[in-house]
């Protein structure tokens, strides 16, 4: 095994390798995960620049259903906890039609899917960030939704989550995820993937880690050796699309790989390399404005500043990426259903604003491996001296179900590469 192999690798529940989405559906992952990381760590980076870009940003703002009106935004961090849903859809943008082919020219070209669904929860005092990724093949109840023409849809007891967008757009996806998670989602953003790949190039790329003996995926054109690799542009697209190159080649394994990218992008966005470069900041802002359709609650640039200020100083070990817990669908081994018991522990911990401890693997279905931290020698304890004050008590974390996989932005993971 390469030195980029696992430091530990627990056995995890293995679901069937889920069917692969279309190339377009795979490609939109770039937008979803990049925009999520941008909103988690880069909100403060881009928010002030959005004043100059606010007209295009708010042009197609979406109204959320059944939402309590928010007070007008004002300078300073937003008060209290909040939830933001990031939805990535596989719309056929004109510049991508030729490259994508039949998906954008055939009978399914008008059926826009929400293949990326990521919930960002920011707690209050102390601030913590929890990023929850939902598998695209998750089967879930869908509530009645209002469509663009004002008509309403019927409730659906069980539907694949990535088909909800075409029923009622961003508002319907938000309502569905809100019902599933018991979270009051005040803000949401629909993300187009056209041009978002440029984010990694604009910041000089993101360094990821390829584990085991390297990564090979003929479907995305990857044939990379093990070790660190800085990816930007098309290589970032290849990395985030790959399913056959990681873990058990399932979409669940791919989520862990995407979370590695998000974690490393968060660290890049909060580094001085980005924060001290005005040209880079403006390029990031312009890309975000061009590729995000917000809800009306998020369309005011001052509101974005409020959200950004609330989360800008969260320590990396308090930014946690998790996969929503699932079980194999007993009626279809290529689909998954919610593990409500495991999820309830997560929602209870968020409601109580408790720190989280992920007991499961760093990624589902063997998608990533955690890199062993460097060995250090603890210094000998200093002799006790009288009159010293007691250290601040450390809050005990909530240990999540082992069926919840994930890691913090402080942890280092590598892709569990296949060759």
Question: Which residues make up each language-model segment?
Answer:
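Non-catalytic, solvent-exposed segments at the cell envelope interface
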Residues: 2-419
